[in-house]
């Protein structure tokens, strides 16, 4: 760095020699934080308006600053702005361009402000906006799941535990389980947005400022509920970014579980669903292949969200108050995590919207593996008053006989069943069909069609105000 360039550095006054080339390389963040250009200009416009309102700068200076910032915004959005790595970050790139446009007046913009509170407010604005986008994407996914669930309230399928056939359920009930998961994700996004909705602008470097600024004015102008209450915490805090990544990682985990179901169900071994061409790819060598690549990539994106969360937690874990340069690394984690989550939500919403269901294969699978064995035991308890543990044992005996004969429970004769328990009568067979099993489970939240329809109605109503 030359002496002339050093003079142009905002912090260059107390230095005699410039930084090493590798220092410039590791110090520059413009390649990452240029994403914050709109938030940086928005924050600067609010700050300048407040400085004029409190008579810290002249109204005429504010008007020049405002005009210059709007020109810069247009230049960036039209692709005419040249970003410089020599100027380190988005803040200094914009400030340097403002100086070129309006002269020394540009230097008044940074009165009563530090890059510490400047980047804190920029980053909060970006995360807040992204949380809102993610929330909307979640709502769209939930809507598609509700459509699918309502179409398949009576589409019977096996329910699993340990990936082994457990009890018959419906596809509608199954999809509503994911609605509950993504509904919690939506709540977490809303909670995080509300908790972070405080403005750090005006905290300055860490101790506040001696200028008579109005932090409530800038907070209101930027859409924050109120200013942050402690200036040290204001510039030290990245909880809002960590909360976003935490909520995002949970959401990605739910997406990954659903993606895994899609991958399994679309395989030849299951044939429960058919994934559209729009979300599948082929093989370069095997012509018959239809690979569920979109679902696999959604499943993989979970690792990026988990990695981003752990990465930023690790950056922050040992930092003394207040700001440290380590925190410059925060944005790359968040930007990458946000992009991964947005892509995953969009892909999953598209897959669910295009999904074709093989009702016959699902029903056939539900009929296998003694899925109504619990109904057998429940009938013994309910109709004959037999203690459940004893009923469980008797049902096991019936299953062993059916396995030996290679038939279903309902295919055993009444005589064979009465050999296990003489009091069994023909009404037992009424509960051993998949349909009767499903429709009997009317407990709150159960798989009976009436309960699933109630769940769907609840979420349709809740989404209106979510």
Curated annotation (Swiss-Prot):
It is found in: Cytoplasm. Pathway: Amino-acid biosynthesis; L-arginine biosynthesis; L-arginine from L-ornithine and carbamoyl phosphate: step 3/3. PROSITE patterns: FUMARATE_LYASES. GO terms for biological process: arginine biosynthetic process via ornithine; L-arginine biosynthetic process. It comes from the Bacteria. CDD domains: Argininosuccinate_lyase. One of its GO terms (molecular function) is argininosuccinate lyase activity. Keywords: Amino-acid biosynthesis, Arginine biosynthesis, Cytoplasm, Lyase. It catalyses: 2-(N(omega)-L-arginino)succinate = fumarate + L-arginine. GO terms for cellular component: cytosol. Its EC number is 4.3.2.1. Belongs to the lyase 1 family. Argininosuccinate lyase subfamily. This is Argininosuccinate lyase.
